[in-house]
Amino acid sequence: MVVFKSLLLNLCILLSVAFYTLLERKVLSSMQIRKGPNKVGLYGIIQPIADALKLFLKEFFIPVNSNSFMFMILPLLGLTLSLMLWAVFPSMWMFNFHSYLLMLFVALTGTFVYVIIFAGWSSNSKYSFLGGMRAAAQTISYEVSMLLLLFFAVLMYRTYSWYEAGLSSPIGIIIFIIMFIWFASCLAETNRAPFDFAEGESELVSGFNIEYYGGMFALLFLAEYSSILFMCMMSTVWFLYSDMIFIMTLLILLIAMAFLFARGVYPRHRYDLLMNLCWKSFLPFSLCCICYSMLLWIV
């Protein structure tokens, strides 16, 4: 029964990712004053299914002199890690109310960096390798400030439990500043615009996944967008309000739309400014938040 529920959850996640990509294309097309997908099905509603069939039915080639085993297994590993993230979210039918599931989230997010690095290295392409190194450096840098902000919320709520954090009230006025920095860190962590330097077309073509196409590219694509939806859910639980299911769903949709608007509105940032923003602005602020929460514990 648990296996069936897990498979059903994964299927729902993949369907959500499929239609989230359709929503992204519709939003970007509206911002650019064009129609977007509107041919496949009613108003283009089944366009993601057509795209998936096209990708998975393509013939698959392995680059010459590449590490074939790692090249083939890493996209599947990336998708598996992204789907495993959803196991830490408490639900009535998954029986996962363990108090320390947040530690599992920290471990899984740290592991995903290796997928990026080795996917770039195993392709035997200098462009993919440089893209992998750049994406890994960016992910590791922003992961520090993101986890510090997360532990600030843990110290304020005085619990590691997702369920208890969801039932708690927001952390007051300071939550608006923290939410802005958390959202920017999530954009950088998931390699989304304006921080998508792993895919700087003028420099690295498509980053670490330049040699992937067809089904392998689709798996990496699903992993990326699954992580985005999970970050939207996590932001709502730990930094906003999630006691009522309707309000929680509305807030998740608003944050998911913010990811799309950030891509359509802002130009790509400069890489050196991105790193300076992390180490000189976000990290000191995150440390100040931790010190503030520790002072509250002492008082």
From Swiss-Prot:
GO CC annotations on file: mitochondrial inner membrane
Record family assignment: Belongs to the complex I subunit 1 family.
Membrane-spanning intervals of the chain: 2-22, 69-89, 101-121, 136-156, 167-187, 214-234, 242-262, 279-299
Enzyme class: translocase
GO BP term (any one): aerobic respiration
Record membrane topology: Multi-pass membrane protein
A Pfam entry, by short name: NADHdh
Source species, domain of life: Eukaryota
UniProt catalytic activity: a ubiquinone + NADH + 5 H(+)(in) = a ubiquinol + NAD(+) + 4 H(+)(out)
Subcellular location: Mitochondrion inner membrane
MF (Gene Ontology): NADH dehydrogenase (ubiquinone) activity
Protein name per Swiss-Prot or TrEMBL: NADH-ubiquinone oxidoreductase chain 1
Family matches, as PROSITE patterns: COMPLEX1_ND1_1 (PS00667), COMPLEX1_ND1_2 (PS00668)
Keywords: Electron transport, Membrane, Mitochondrion, Mitochondrion inner membrane, NAD, Respiratory chain, Translocase, Transmembrane, Transmembrane helix, Transport, Ubiquinone
Cited function: Core subunit of the mitochondrial membrane respiratory chain NADH dehydrogenase (Complex I) that is believed to belong to the minimal assembly required for catalysis. Complex I functions in the transfer of electrons from NADH to the respiratory chain. The immediate electron acceptor for the enzyme is believed to be ubiquinone.
Gene that encodes it: ND1
Keyword Transmembrane helix: yes
EC numbers: 7.1.1.2
